[in-house]
Amino acid sequence: MARRLLEIASNSVASALAAQAGGADRIELFDNLAEGGTTPSYGSIAVARERLRIPLFVLIRARPGDFHYEALEAEIMLRDIAHCRQLGCDGVVIGALDADGNVDTALCQRLVSAAGPLQVTFHRAFDAARDLPAALEQVIALGCQRVLTSGGKASAEAGADTLAALVAQSNARISVMAGAGLNARNIAAVAARTGCVELHASAKAAQCSAMRHHNPALVGLSPDWTVTDAGEVAALRAALDAI
């Protein structure tokens, strides 16, 4: 089997560079990890594109919460896709549902069309759909190159059987990329069990603040943050290469 592709979800430019150093094949850049991810700033995308030597995909998501978007949010996402094209990104990561949990094909077709020559990944809005096999056919019809999914479960490990069924259903018409809860201990088993040849992980670690001064009155405002760990990325890569 061909070498399995490792995509790292990176919540900052620093995380993206760490992922590259660790051996990632591709970056998904986003902001607001704690809220499931939103579109990163123009500056973050621009600097990431300048610094990275590997493919850069950008999450297009106007806000946290559900995946049912209003016209204003759609306008914002279309503008963000235009910026990604302007900055030379390799792909965008999109997704939208209607109120009944079906793929919002009208909006998604606009997003895919706006992406033009860029590759398109349908994100984990897919896992929130009411009928995953039906949703997969809709995503394929949109012309997306891949779908990121945990098989509708809390983790790709828990959804491995569904992922395997989706891979079989796809019949090479689209790449089913496994993601959610993957680490160096389970990624090889998930890859082997599902047949997924693209895998998505965050490889995140806590970054402690270097501040010596801290105001204890600011309850809930932690000075620490989360970054991608290059060592964990390397461990993920090694685990996949050992299959």
Question: Which ranges hold each PLM region?
Answer:
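Catalytic cores of alpha/beta
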Residues: 11-21, 68-83, 127-142, 166-171, ...
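Glycine-rich nucleotide/cofactor/substrate-binding loop typically near the N-terminus or early
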Residues: 60-69
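Glycine-enriched alpha-helix->loop->beta-strand junction motifs that scaffold or abut catalytic
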Residues: 21-27, 52-55, 88-91, 114-118, ...
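Glycine-rich phosphate-binding active-site loops on the catalytic face of alpha/beta enzymes
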Residues: 26-38, 83-101, 144-157, 194-217, ...
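Hydrophobic faces of well-ordered beta-strands that scaffold small-molecule active sites
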Residues: 4-10, 27-29, 56-60, 92-94, ...
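C-terminal alpha-helical cap/extension of soluble enzyme domains
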Residues: 170-243
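Active-site-adjacent beta->alpha loops and helix N-cap segments on the catalytic face
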Residues: 14, 33-57, 71-75, 96-116, ...
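N-terminal amphipathic alpha-helix/helix-capping segment at the start of soluble metabolic enzymes
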Residues: 1-9, 13, 49-50
